[in-house]
Amino acid sequence: SGSSEETQAPAADTGDAAQEAETSEETDAAEADTEAAGEADLSADSGEIYIFISSPEYADAINTLIDEYKNVAPNVTINYETTQNDYPTLLKAKINSGDVPDIFSSTSGMEIDTYREYSYDLTGQPIVDAMDDGVAAAMTSAEEGGKGCYGLAIKGNYFGLIWNQNILDDCGISAPETLDDFKKACETVEAKGYQACTTGFMEWWVYKHNVMDFLNAAAKANGEATADMVAKFQAGEAKIKDYSVLYDNWFDYIDTAVKYGDDKPLETDLSGEEQAFAAGNTAFMLGQGAWVEADLLAINPDLKIGFGGYPVDADPADCQVVSGSDQALHVYKDSKNLQTVLNFVNWWYTSEYGQSWFTDVAGVVPPIKTDKESAYTIIEQGKKSVEEKGSGDLSICYSTDSFNQAFGEAMQSYIAGTTDKDATCAQIEKDWHEIDGAAK
């Protein structure tokens, strides 16, 4: 990425890039007529694409996609960089220095508008016709009244609790659907000689995944929509203590996960969590979803996986799998190689290889319109759970990832014992108001 900083067009010249953006839709429409930006059209394409995104769990799959694209467009060079820790901070530093990646990521929802001034509106591109309607809805601008398509997704998704079905069978218990059942299950599993939980609590982003069902249940108990409750916290008009599911149940859940979890929870990252669960001696894997199954089965092909929502209170109906597209990839609207970037993303969503990549390589819930069944248990059980119990609200998207990171760090301080529950709540409330209240 260093070289792209040196060759970045100065601010005074961005008019040319904007003009290129205006004309690119016409160019692309012509290409769409011939095999939807298909492979035959791309062999003469050239240029560099700099991708800087989060989600390192998809690094292998994306590298496979890039390798395949090399066969299609041999003169296009794709420089791909990924990180999870401090991604929002690193991205903002790149944007401020003028080194804006050609493709960058954020959460969907609120952050679509946060980064809209840098994002190309994909409306009219072949990719939008192929995109799942629910995913496309997450890419619209709330400030523009639900218009535009300012991103694409690596995946739709399912978030929830993963368990080792063999361990639950051996212990004679079913998957917990209430918080009390979860605590009892952890006791039973440990008494039988297994580890109950592996948490990944070193990663800030696992907390935002864990908390979604709690946010939804807290709002429901108060007779309000989750989005409205989150907006109150952002405005500085709500306290965690006002919501028993957050003040009591959430911390009870975290305490239970730590008590029955990894020896060093704050040193257990995604890889450590995957290794611990795949070893076959741990009952519950927290904070994850459909994206980990391929890694788990690569380590232990005999693993029997179960998947459902998080147990958050006394009502099994609130134990819901959360589905949707939580992440957006943005195309930089003033990219020097805008057409080359558009050709790549259109190929990804419309070519036969690109469409099969989602299920066959990445093992994710496809963000495209498709009837193809998945070979992955989490995706199929997630789909079944949503059909039976409905989907939980993708509530992390009502906040920015800058807040979500601060939330994760506040919870890490709580687990470390450096802040108590009330101080942690005060910090979360302060961050929600200062980070996301200011972002509105």
PLM ranges: what are they?
Residues 32-41, 107-160, 174, 183, ...:
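Hinge/lid segment of periplasmic solute-binding proteins
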Residues 68-135, 166-177, 284, 299-300, ...:
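Extracytoplasmic "Venus flytrap"/periplasmic binding protein-like
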Residues 146-154, 183-236:
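Extracytoplasmic/periplasmic solute-binding protein
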Residues 93-94, 102, 130-166, 195-196, ...:
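A structural signal for short loop-to-beta-strand junctions that line the ligand-binding cleft
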Residues 52, 111-112, 249-336:
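Extracytoplasmic/periplasmic substrate-binding proteins
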Residues 169, 387-440:
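Conserved C-terminal helix/tail region of periplasmic/extracytoplasmic solute-binding proteins
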Residues 188, 230-266:
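Glycine-centered hinge/linker elements that transmit conformational signals in sensory
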Residues 71-72, 77, 97, 147, ...:
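Extracytoplasmic/periplasmic substrate-recognition and gating elements
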